[in-house]
Structure formats: C-alpha cells, structure tokens
C-alpha cells in the first residue's frame, strides 16, 4: 500500500479522512453566503437567480463546448456548496436528464466529478429523488469504480455511490455494494486495476464505514468487513489506517446495538463483551495490540499534526472496541446556529464526514434547514436561531418555539444512544412487516 496518485486531489486539507479535520474549527462560522469575491455572482443577481440562470443556460444551449459546460457545472456546484439549493421547481426533470446524459457519456475528469457532486447535492436538497437517481446511476457508478482510468474518478464513484446507497436505506443494496468494497480491500485495489493505490483503498475503507452505519441485521457481511478492515490497519498510508480504524469502530458499535446482551446483569464483564464479538473478530487480542500501537505511534517519519490525529482517533477506536458498553467515549460536537449538535457515535461521525465531503461549507446550512439531513445524522431536535419565515427551511412554523438546543432537551449521550437503538428496532420491525406483506401478496397471486 505505497502508491500515491500525485495528479488526484480528491480532498482538500480541510476534507481529509480524519475525524478531527471535519469536526474541528467552527463549522457554524463557515461562510455560506458571500460569493462576490469568487466571481460567481454578477451584477445585482441573487444567488438563486444566478443558479437558475446557469441551469437554464446549461439546458437550453444545444451546442456548448466542453470548456463552457465545465464552467456552468462548476458555477452550479459552487453555489450549491454555499447555499441550501432546494427551491428549483422548474426544469428539474430537464436538469436531471441532462446531468445523467453527461454522467453516462465520455467526459473529462473534472466534468464528470462535478456532475456526480451536483447530483448528490440535489439529492441531499431533496430536489432529486434518491431512489430514482440510484436506480438510474447504479450501473454507471459500478462501471466507473471498476474500469475508470483515473483514480480520482474511481474514488469519486466509490464515495458518492456509497452515500446514495446509504440514503437509499435498503440493507440488501448496502450489503451488495459493501461486498464489492470488501473485495477492493482484500486485493489492495487490484480487483479494480488499482493495486496498492492508497487513494482508492482509503476511499473504499471510508465508504465501507459509511455503509456499516446502515446495517441493522445479522449477516456474514459483518465478519467479512471486519477482517478486511483489520488488514488495512497495517497499511503504509495513514489515511488508509484512519479510515479503516473508524470503519472498524463503527462496525463494533453497530454489532453492539444489533446484538442484545446475553446476560444484562453481567454486560460490563470482559467475558460477555468478548464473547459477543468472537465470530466477528476471532483474534480480538491481536487487534487490540495493533490498535494500542497505532494509538501511541511515535515514528519520526510521521508529522506532528498527523501523529496527533492518529493518536486521538485510535484512542477512541481502541476504547470502542475494548469496552463496547462504555459510555461517553465520543464527545465531539459542532455548533450550528445556536444549537449544539452532538456527534457522540461513530455512525454520526462517519455520516457527517461524508456530508461534509459533498456539501463543503454549506453543510451547516443544509443541516439547519433540512429535516432529511438531520434525520440522517440522528438529530432529533430543531436548530435554534433559524428564522421560521425562511422560505428555504422545511420547518413547520407552528413549532417555532421548539427550536431548542439538543443539548438542553435533557437527553444524555446514553439516552440518545438508547433512543437510536429503539429506532433501529422499529426500523427492523417495519422492514419485516413490509416483507411479510409483499410475500403475502405474491403468494396470493400464484
């Protein structure tokens, strides 16, 4: 695992794999408005007028050069990563059709990446329907992940399709794409003709971690994922190690929630905690040794900043795997508006990372205004300080008095985690009821 693609700039320094870069700083202070300095807005146009005008130009101009098309796409994406771009009522069907045409055709890397990002962003803004877009793009995304010549395109396809799959919330599809990602890890990228490409392998770890947050039932997929991720802890790349470690922590977190304690009176004992994961990680002791080494890595070849990130992340990963029932391991939070958003689980952290990757500086605005985004991150409160009259917001104005800080709702991190567990159980029950209904209809007709 030593090859680096020097031409690929998959993420900026602020969007790297580690938890710290995404959660540090003041996400609530990120600019989500002014674009005059970047030359995006012209004259007296508002951002929405400029967005609609650019979309119209892209749709209506039949003969447009690749360079001009790239400029239009870049302008659309820049606006969408500074504002909650939900109010595009006209030309939605035409825009989706055009983006799919660009996506499926032979394009430059930049044009293709911009198109992928825009499609994901409009799904997050509920402009496009996730299920429809996922169905229309599945084949192409898989082809790009397997056969694209550019590592950047492979990485983009892996990350963005994993996000669409997570948003789709279909466990069968999650496992199917997850198995593909596992094959990438097991072969160090060779299965997609990217052997020892740390970018591709790192993205596969990151994407697999995201998909693991969607798993709600027992399957062999969990053990296969754990084995593949454990092997990547020995990778030469710190980014790969971090992505693999966080994904492993998310896996243990999910297993701990899926499997009820065999003996609740003794659920704090080392014996019960260990036996609970025996079939997932047969050699758990060796895994813990590896994690302790990473949590205290002192090699001079690693920069001071990287070493700090490595230590902090792997201390949390180690505690999650060593003491699955421990409380308050993760104490990350971000400030959005006047609300404190607790990211106190690996599920929330990995999902926030992927949203931050696609949405950039508009993450906080999308979170504040979109119930869909807040639900995806497991946030049950409202965002204080947001005007109920904002036309972009999907809040019910009748509940304006309930825009309160989640931290003040009286829920401890333990209570929030228990609430998530109840929701997962209800989700599984709903899936069973739906499956039973479909089977009853099918068999009644045959």
Curated annotation (Swiss-Prot):
The keyword Phosphoprotein applies. Belongs to the IFRD family. Pfam families: IFRD (PF05004). The modification Phosphoserine is found at residues 393, 397. It comes from Schizosaccharomyces pombe (strain 972 / ATCC 24843). It comes from the Eukaryota. The lineage of its organism: Eukaryota, Fungi, Dikarya, Ascomycota, Taphrinomycotina. Keywords: Cytoplasm, Phosphoprotein. GO terms for cellular component: cytosol; nucleus. SUPFAM superfamilies: ARM repeat. This is Uncharacterized protein C20F10.03. It is found in: Cytoplasm. Residues 411-431 are annotated as: Disordered.
């Amino acid at each position: 695992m030593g090859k680096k693609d020097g031409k690929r700039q998959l993420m900026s320094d602020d969007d790297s794999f580690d938890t710290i870069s995404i959660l540090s700083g003041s996400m609530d202070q990120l600019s989500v408005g002014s674009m005059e300095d970047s030359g995006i807005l012209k004259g007296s146009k508002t951002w929405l007028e400029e967005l609609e005008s650019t979309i119209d130009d892209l749709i209506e101009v039949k003969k447009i050069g690749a360079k001009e098309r790239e400029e239009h796409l870049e302008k659309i994406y820049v606006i969408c990563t500074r504002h909650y771009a939900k109010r595009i009522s006209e030309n939605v069907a035409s825009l989706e059709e055009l983006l799919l045409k660009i996506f499926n055709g032979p394009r430059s890397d930049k044009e293709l990446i911009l198109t992928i990002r825009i499609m994901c962003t409009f799904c997050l803004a509920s402009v496009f329907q996730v299920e429809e877009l996922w169905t229309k793009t599945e084949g192409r995304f898989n082809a790009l992940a397997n056969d694209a010549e550019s590592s950047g395109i492979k990485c983009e396809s892996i990350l963005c399709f994993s996000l669409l799959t997570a948003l789709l919330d279909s466990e069968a599809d999650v496992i199917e794409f997850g198995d593909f990602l596992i094959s990438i890890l097991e072969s160090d990228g060779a299965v997609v003709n990217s052997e020892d490409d740390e970018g591709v392998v790192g993205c596969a770890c990151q994407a697999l971690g995201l998909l693991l947050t969607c798993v709600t039932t027992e399957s062999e997929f969990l053990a296969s994922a754990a084995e593949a991720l454990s092997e990547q802890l020995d990778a030469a790349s710190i980014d790969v190690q971090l992505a693999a470690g966080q994904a492993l922590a998310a896996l243990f977190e999910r297993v701990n929630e899926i499997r009820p304690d065999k003996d609740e009176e003794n659920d704090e004992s080392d014996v019960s905690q260990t036996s609970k994961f025996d079939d997932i990680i047969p050699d758990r002791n060796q895994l813990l040794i590896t994690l302790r080494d990473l949590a205290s890595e002192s090699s001079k070849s690693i920069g001071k900043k990287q070493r700090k990130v490595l230590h902090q992340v792997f201390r949390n990963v180690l505690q999650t795997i060593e003491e699955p029932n421990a409380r308050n391991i993760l104490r990350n939070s971000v400030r959005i508006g006047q609300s404190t958003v607790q990211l106190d689980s690996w599920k929330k952290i990995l999902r926030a990372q992927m949203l931050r990757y696609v949405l950039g500086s508009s993450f906080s605005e999308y979170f504040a205004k979109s119930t869909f985004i807040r639900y995806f991150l497991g946030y049950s409160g409202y965002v204080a300080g947001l005007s109920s009259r904002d036309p972009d917001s999907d809040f019910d104005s009748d509940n304006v008095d309930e825009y309160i800080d989640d931290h003040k709702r009286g829920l401890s991190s333990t209570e929030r985690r228990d609430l998530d567990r109840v929701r997962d159980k209800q989700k599984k029950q709903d899936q069973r009821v739906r499956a039973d209904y479909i089977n009853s209809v099918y068999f009644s007709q045959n």
